[in-house]
């Protein structure tokens, strides 16, 4: 996951230089992800800090949040794979890179191994490999 903003928003408001500065920026979020109006960042020595944010836009889908960020309306957090191209093109700029966002864990729920069909095992194996490769690619 990565905290990003568009160059247009940063030209208008400047770059946040500390986690506390994030409250000065409008924030776009996927509904329910930052329900407490706070985001977690990793500070030095892997210490988690909770930082308040000013949520101005919420959507049930990340694509709407991405569009809002690209339009320069807010800063926000997205999964790295969904905005990798925009970051490479310079349409989104990572913020506070020395305070990374903790990753989400990914889980596959399935019946006990003895009850899992061959097709489900193959699908789970392919999905695991695909996601591992996708999520390990560098974000910026």
Placement of each model-derived feature along the sequence:
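A generic structural signal for short hydrophobic patches within well-formed alpha-helices
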Residues: 1, 9-10, 65, 83
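Short Pro/Gly-enriched coil loops immediately N-terminal to beta-strands
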Residues: 1-5, 21-23, 98-104
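Flexible hinge/capping segments at coil-to-helix
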Residues: 4-30
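Alpha-helical segments flanking ligand/cofactor-binding loops in enzyme cores
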Residues: 20, 66-67, 121
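Secondary-structure junction motif
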Residues: 26-47
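Short beta-strand-to-loop elements that line the ligand-binding cleft
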Residues: 29, 50-61, 99
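A ligand-binding cleft/hinge motif common to bilobed small-molecule-binding domains
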Residues: 65-91
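C-terminal effector-binding regulatory domain of bacterial HTH transcription factors
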Residues: 80-89, 99-140
């Amino acid at each position: 996951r990565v905290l990003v903003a568009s160059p247009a928003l940063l030209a208008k408001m400047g770059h946040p230089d500390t986690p506390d500065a994030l409250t000065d920026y409008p924030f776009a979020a996927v509904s329910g992800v930052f329900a407490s109006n706070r985001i977690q960042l990793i500070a030095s020595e892997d210490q988690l800090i909770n930082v308040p944010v000013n949520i101005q836009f919420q959507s049930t889908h990340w694509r709407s949040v991405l569009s809002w960020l690209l339009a320069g309306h807010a800063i926000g957090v997205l999964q790295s794979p969904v905005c990798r191209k925009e970051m490479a093109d310079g349409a989104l700029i990572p913020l506070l890179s020395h305070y990374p966002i903790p990753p989400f864990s990914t889980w596959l729920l399935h019946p006990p191994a003895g009850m899992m069909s061959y097709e489900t095992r193959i699908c789970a194996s392919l999905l695991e490999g695909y996601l591992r490769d996708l999520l390990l690619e560098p974000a910026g």
